[in-house]
From Swiss-Prot:
Taxonomic superkingdom: Bacteria
Subunit-structure text: Homohexamer.
SUPFAM superfamilies: HprK N-terminal domain-like, PEP carboxykinase-like
Origin species: Streptococcus mutans serotype c (strain ATCC 700610 / UA159)
Positions that bind ATP: 153-160
Annotated active site: 138, 159, 177, 243
Domains as described in the record: The Walker A ATP-binding motif also binds Pi and PPi.
Catalytic activity entry: [HPr protein]-L-serine + ATP = [HPr protein]-O-phospho-L-serine + ADP + H(+); [HPr protein]-O-phospho-L-serine + phosphate + H(+) = [HPr protein]-L-serine + diphosphate
Other known facts: Both phosphorylation and phosphorolysis are carried out by the same active site and suggest a common mechanism for both reactions.
Entry GO MF terms: ATP binding; magnesium ion binding; phosphorelay sensor kinase activity; protein serine/threonine kinase activity; protein serine/threonine/tyrosine kinase activity
An annotated GO BP: regulation of carbohydrate metabolic process
Protein's recorded name: HPr kinase/phosphorylase
Amino acid sequence: MSVTVQMLVDKVKLDVIYGTQELLQKEIATADISRPGLEMTGYFDYYAPERIQLLGMKEWSYLTQMTSHNRYSVLKEMFQTETPAIIVARDLTIPEEMLLAAKEEGIAVLQSHVPTSRLSGEMSWYLDSCLAERTSVHGVLMDIYGMGVLIQGDSGIGKSETGLELVKRGHRLVADDRVDVFAKDEETLWGEPAEILRHLLEIRGVGIINVMSLYGASAVKDSSQVQLSIFLENFEKDKMFDRLGNGNEDIELSGVKIPRIRIPVKTGRNVSVVIEAAAMNYRAKQMGYDATETFEKRLTNLIDQNEASHD
């Protein structure tokens, strides 16, 4: 997904001090944000002009102590064709030399009242989300008790119907059919719907329904971290399934591993309730309580007691 300067302006509510419509449509190539410190002294080795240039109190203070000529020279060298924009935080005064250099080089000048570190974090979060490489997977992504659960399985097994039942039980739909996943970092996976499928569920025999229209805004979510994969598969009498919950299986999506739980599906089984329980049990494990481990300890103690009674 490409991101323009205008999209960034709208998302983090920046003020446009200078920028034609053409300049605001310039694409941002990287999520990295530069705080030009050494560049202010004239040291431009390893300078990354393709990044958003963000000036906070320290950079601004140093810049304002320069002579007008030196200030213009530094800014002129800093502003290059591939530079998307320069942003001044904290509503600090924009030097005239900055506007002059920006107009000459064709660089948008933006301003924000937000403190520098917070502004940098907001922009990084947004740009990382937009510019991260995406992988499309088949399934239903639900927010269950605040945890992102990716429901997968063979076609026709009832993933969308299960998603609808979970919505009726108070959980939130993120995406149905196609889920676009991307890595926020090495350990964090996020998912979102394809734009054309946002808020929609396809139910066999009924057709396409708009979950937001039928159940309200509280029933949908635009994106979610993906923390758990539930794989639905047809129940087979002779097939072995994990009965104790101590079988560890992971899947890797966009370079991030997440745990997977396989749930057998057969007529009469309330799959949505089972998925709720699986999600809550996984969260309990993350908080340090493992029911399987507790059971195994009780079983071991019982065996030890029986052996002691026979001695």
